From Swiss-Prot:
Encoding gene, per UniProt annotation: Rfc1
Protein name in UniProt: Replication factor C subunit 1
Molecular function GO terms recorded: ATP binding; ATP hydrolysis activity; DNA binding; DNA clamp loader activity; DNA clamp unloader activity
Region (Disordered): 14-87, 92-111, 120-201, 225-378, 491-525, 1073-1131
Organism: Mus musculus (Mouse)
Function text: Subunit of the replication factor C (RFC) complex which acts during elongation of primed DNA templates by DNA polymerases delta and epsilon, and is necessary for ATP-dependent loading of proliferating cell nuclear antigen (PCNA) onto primed DNA. This subunit binds to the primer-template junction. Binds the PO-B transcription element as well as other GA rich DNA sequences. Can bind single- or double-stranded DNA.
Phosphotyrosine modifications at: 66
Residue ranges, compositional bias (Basic and acidic residues): 38-54, 184-201, 334-350, 359-373, 1113-1123
């Protein structure tokens, strides 16, 4: 059978007569096929619950819906045929109907003459013997022949039959749910007598059936696609469901039927399935129906239950059964893999056909699509949701101090009387912590309107307490106060330090007592001598005078030390004394410990490995850095890089020389410093041992702020530093802030890379609160959080801010600390790409930025910021548009107008030097476009293309100016005329001989160039200027051999030009004051020599050199003869 007819894709014509003859041959085996077909029907009806529940009339009329264009004509013929057949029916009585009826619904056409053929055939049977419709001479036969002759041209299409098995494959046909159409056609034959009663009823029924069929097709497409997606899983589910033997028998009978059909040829297959799906006469259908009901009573009952069940429950059951079966299959596969892993290779006989579970199809299930749809709708509602409706209506309670400390909160949705940020600051004010996602550590979920479904589901699964807005306020109101754990830790640390201080004086006193007896004996001897010499009164006075002096000295020393400590800054006062005290560097794999191990093993590693590393850089590097001669510490300021380097050197006993940005680090100064540091000895060695210490190798060089080596002061410093690293005999420690700086990229390959990260807020907070407790400064822990975040986690900046605020008052509240930290917020330098991203960014990042903050983005680099905005505003999807293209275009238009206004202001600033208009330009060029197009960028910010185009415009203008000057003696025209009228023709004249003649055309081109006084550079410039952008020039398409021949021919000859060929060189006479005198003298000598060479006559191209003849001239001979005579006369 044709698969296109099976699905009703095209309108089929009348069945040809040959097919009816073929069907007569297959009628003998029709009984057996019917039995199997009944089993198939039962199986299909169980799977296709949706189609079975529909009325039976619609399926019958499907043949009429896909009718040809001549429907009106056929209906008239049907009416006449019916009237004649009714007259004949009076004389004939139908006898027993035989099953071998060749006209019983054999035709596959969609026309109404099927009914005529059926009725006429039934009337022509007498005494149980069927008369041949082609041999009889009755009126019915005449009517049949008239109808056939009229309808033959309506079905001229001959279609090659295609089997369902060939189209879908054997497995798909076994499990196809679309065979429900055949059973419905059989059932619909019972209702044919009702449609014959009245012609008007037939027309009305046709119209109704057309509408019903269209609706059914609309709903059937989606179901058909889903059944195709679930074809491979359905049979397994039905096997699991059916425990009765009848289900197994039906499935096996279907398989037997299919195996028989496969043995035959493809046309036989088509006939077999076409006869199986055709309907037959009412009497025969009644018998077949009764036999089916008798054979399969349980399946008919099961079919009724399936028809009564709703669609949704059936689909859910199918999906659940499918998931269970796929899960069981995966478990079985995993178990088989484990067994096969334990078995030897010879026993691995598991077939690969078992791995048929379609994982990709499960991801495209209806549940997943529904989830995606709901997530999309939730996100859209999140973007469009309203703010608090009763803002400020509820009184915010005042809770106890640190009442929420140790509790973690998550806020979701919109709170009605308070903003989200205010709720977050309220929780943090009382010591609580607010996170973004629900986890096991979350104590409370504060839920508002339009809350997130995933957070609420996760909180319910983890057993997290859910609060509303009132519940949060009641919790703050009722929770008791707590003492901060940071204060308790600071007190414990203070007690430990006091106990240490109390123990240390006792040790000193014991040491003094041990040493004092020898001194006392010497002093007693002196006292005796003085007593003998002097009177006792004098000795008493001396003793009395010496004792108070010693006391005064101790007191003054203590007072001086206390005064010095008070004068010190907190940064120096609480500077770490050991590596353990550095914040954020306590771990074993921290950068401080890595540097310590690297420096300890620096002299142990062989110099060959270090040379190899210096040559090949990253390729020879190791995790411990043993192959590097230098280390590079990079990270943000205030994280302890310099402190780490100095403490590591002190701990290992290295003496170090530090060069920072305040020192001159040029090429010569680096040589001198390194040479001195290699030969120097520390003065500390003279005190430890009496003799002068020998020169040791335990020296180190610390180069701080390497990325700041620029300008005339440090010219050549980076290259000299790299050279020192290659040949150094001492370790070098370099430090920088920006590791991605262009100057550092070459240095990175020769250094052990150690990247410092900012410490966490908790690490900094505990150390700062202990320092504040020692200084008597009362700061609540939430206020300390704000101070640390305001300083961008810079430990040095936090200490400076604390010392400054402590000078005013010894207590800080949360609000005061938050306000002060915002005012003292550290300014961070942003690049142009970061500025552009922030100008158009939407969300929390820019939600609280004021107008001044937005205009400050413009002032990061006011010369290039407008260009970045103009280049990237087209790549932003604005939130205000909401996906509407018309609104998007309106916003683009307004942003473009604002950028144009900003350009007009910039023109006024540059032309009239009116720099007071810069804030106005900031509003037009940055703030307004950012507000209009605030949204999400679809790509990384791109560099302004205007800069490249402006540069190429200037270059081309300069080239055209030079060309017009060189050709002025021939063209006598302006620059514009040369550009528009001459260059294109000159280009063609220069390239055409080379393309047509090849190497031989080079001389012709050179002659033309000499005519117009053009140089080789002018030739290349003409090719560049006269070709359109992006397209290759005509000269570039030439053969390389021709180009080389042209270049050689041009260089052989001397070319005279009416203009001077001056080579512009940068004069180095005006050197900066930072250069040494030796270098400046060398530069001056080089410049004078170059000037003399330029002024020499021999080097001038316009003067022709004289060729010296081989014979000497007369004057030269006379001079030589005079010289010879003088020599002889002297002798």
């Amino acid at each position: 059978m044709d698969i296109r007819k099976f699905f009703g894709v095209i309108s089929s014509g009348k069945k040809p007569v040959n097919e009816t003859v073929k069907n007569e041959k297959t009628k003998a085996s029709e009984g057996t096929v019917k039995g199997k077909k009944g089993v198939k029907e039962a199986k299909v009806n169980n799977s296709g619950k949706e189609d079975a529940s529909k009325p039976k009339q619609h399926s019958k009329k499907k043949r009429i819906i896909y009718d040809s264009d001549s429907e009106s004509e056929e209906t008239v013929q049907v009416k006449n045929a019916k009237k004649k057949s009714e007259k004949l029916s009076l004389s004939y009585k139908p006898g027993k109907v035989s099953q071998k009826d060749p006209v019983t619904y054999v035709s596959e056409t969609d026309e109404d003459d099927d009914f005529v053929c059926k009725k006429a055939a039934s009337k022509s049977k007498e005494n149980g013997v069927s008369t041949n419709s082609y041999l009889g001479t009755s009126n019915v036969k005449k009517n049949e022949e008239n109808v056939k002759t009229k309808n033959k041209p309506l079905s001229p299409i001959k279609l090659t039959p295609t089997s369902v098995l060939d189209y879908f494959g054997t497995e798909s046909v076994q499990r196809s749910g679309k065979k429900m159409v055949t059973s419905k056609r059989k059932e619909s034959s019972q209702n044919t007598e009702d449609s014959r009663l009245n012609d008007e009823a037939i027309a009305k029924q046709l119209q109704l059936d057309e509408d019903a069929e269209l609706e059914r097709q609309l709903h059937e497409d989606e179901e058909f696609a889903r059944t195709l997606a679930l074809l491979d899983e359905e049979p397994k589910i039905k096997k699991a469901r059916k425990d009765s033997e009848e289900g197994e028998e039906s499935f096996s009978s279907v398989q037997d039927d299919l195996s028989k059909a496969e043995k035959q040829k493809s046309p036989n297959k088509a006939e077999l399935f076409s006869t199986a799906r055709k309907t037959y006469s009412p009497a025969k259908h009644g018998k077949g129906r009764a036999s089916e009901d008798a054979k399969q009573p349980c399946k008919s009952a099961h079919r009724k239950e399936a028809c009564s069940s709703p669609k949704a429950s059936a689909k859910l059951a199918l999906m659940k059964a499918k998931e269970e079966s796929s899960y069981n299959e995966t478990e079985l596969l995993a178990a088989r893999r484990k067994e096969s892993a334990t078995e030897p290779k010879g026993e691995k006989t598991t077939p690969k056909k078992t791995k048929v579970s379609p994982t990709k199809r499960e991801s495209v299930s209806p549940e997943d699509s529904e989830k995606k749809r709901t997530n999309y709708q939730a996100y859209r509602s999140y973007l469009n949701r309203e703010g608090p409706k009763a803002l400020g209506s509820k009184e915010i309670p005042k809770g106890a101090e640190n009442c929420l400390e140790g509790l973690t909160f998550v806020i979701t949705g919109v709170l009605e009387s308070i903003e989200r940020d205010e709720a977050k600051s309220l929780i943090e004010r009382y010591g609580g912590k607010v996170t973004g996602n629900v986890s096991k550590k979350t104590n409370y979920l504060v839920m508002g309107r339009d809350s997130g479904q995933s957070k609420s589901d996760k909180a319910a699964a983890l057993g997290t307490k859910i609060l509303d807005e009132d519940g949060l306020l009641d919790l703050i109101r009722t929770m008791p106060g707590k003492r901060s754990k940071y204060e308790m830790a600071a007190e414990a640390e203070m007690k430990k330090e006091k106990s240490k201080l109390e123990r240390t004086p006792q040790k000193n006193d014991q040491g003094k007592r041990k040493i004092s007896p020898a001194k006392k004996e010497s002093e007693s001897k002196k006292c005796k001598l003085t007593l003998l010499k002097n009177s006792p009164m004098k000795a008493v006075k001396k003793e009395a005078s010496t004792c108070p002096r010693g006391l005064d000295v101790k007191e003054t020393h203590g007072n001086r030390s206390s005064n010095k400590e008070e004068c010190l800054l907190w940064v120096d006062k609480y500077k770490p004394a050991s590596l353990k005290n550095i914040i954020g560097q306590q771990g074993d794999q921290s950068c401080a410990n890595k540097l310590l191990r690297w420096l300890r093993n620096w002299h142990k590693s062989s110099p060959e490995e270090k040379k190899h590393a210096a040559k090949f850089g990253k390729l020879a590097s190791k995790d411990d850095g043993s192959s590097f001669k230098a280390a590079l510490l990079s990270g943000p300021p205030g994280v302890g890089k310099t402190t780490t380097a100095s403490l590591v050197c002190q701990e290992l006993g290295y003496s170090y020389v530090e060069l920072n940005a305040s020192d001159t680090r040029s090429k010569n100064s680096l040589k001198a410093v390194v040479a001195e540091s290699l030969n120097n000895t520390s003065i500390k060695g003279f005190y430890t041992s009496g003799a002068a210490p020998s020169v040791s190798a335990r020296h180190a060089l610390i180069m701080d702020e390497v990325d700041g080596m620029a300008g005339n002061e440090d010219r050549g410093g980076i290259q000299e530093l790299i050279g020192l690293i290659k040949h150094t005999k001492i370790p070098i420690i370099c430090m920088c802030n920006d590791r991605n700086h262009p100057k550092i990229r070459s240095l990175v390959h020769y250094c052990f890379d150690l990247r410092f990260q900012r410490p966490r807020v908790e690490q900094i907070k505990s150390a700062m609160l202990s320092i504040a407790f020692k200084e008597g400064l009362k700061i609540p822990p939430p206020a300390m959080n704000e101070i640390i975040l305001g300083a961008n986690q810079d430990v040095r900046q936090v200490l400076h801010n604390l010392s400054m605020w402590c000078a005013q008052s010894k207590a800080l509240t949360y609000d005061q600390a938050k306000a002060d930290s915002q005012r003292a917020k550290k300014d961070i330098r942003l690049g142009p790409f970061d500025v552009t991203r922030k100008v158009f960014a939407a969300g929390e990042e820019t939600a609280h930025m004021s107008l001044m903050d937005k205009s400050d983005l413009f002032f990061h680099d006011y010369s290039i910021a407008p260009l970045f905005v103009q280049e990237n505003y087209l790549h932003v999807k604005p939130v205000a548009a909401g996906g509407d293209m018309k609104k998007h275009l309106m916003l683009l238009s307004r942003a473009a107008d604002s950028i144009c206004d900003g350009d007009l202001v910039d023109n006024q600033i540059r032309s009239k030097q009116n720099w007071s208009l810069l804030p106005t330009q900031a509003i037009y060029a940055s703030v307004l476009p950012g507000e209009l197009m605030r949204g999400y960028m679809t790509q990384f910010p791109s560099f302004p293309s205007w800069l490249g185009k402006h540069s190429s415009t200037g270059k081309h203008d300069r080239i055209v100016q030079d060309l017009s000057l060189h050709m002025s003696l021939r063209t006598y025209s302006s620059k514009r005329t040369v550009n528009m009228d001459y260059l294109s023709h000159i280009r063609d004249a220069l390239v055409r001989p080379l393309t047509s003649q090849g190497v031989e055309g080079a001389q012709h081109v050179i002659k033309l160039m000499d005519t117009y006084y053009l140089m080789k550079e002018d030739f290349e410039n003409i090719m560049e200027v006269s070709s359109w952008g992006g397209k290759p020039s005509a000269f570039s398409k030439l053969d390389p051999k021709v180009k080389a021949a042209f270049t050689r021919a041009y260089n052989k000859e001397a070319h005279l030009t009416p203009y001077s060929l001056q080579v512009v060189k940068t004069s180095r006479l005006s050197t900066g004051p930072a250069l040494d005198s030796e270098y400046s003298e060398e530069f001056q000598e080089d410049d004078t020599q170059s000037e003399k060479e330029q002024d020499a006559v021999e080097t001038d191209a316009m003067i022709k050199k004289k060729t010296r003849s081989s014979k000497p001239s007369k004057s030269e001979r006379e001079k030589e003869s005079k010289k010879g005579k003088g020599k002889n006369w002297k002798k």
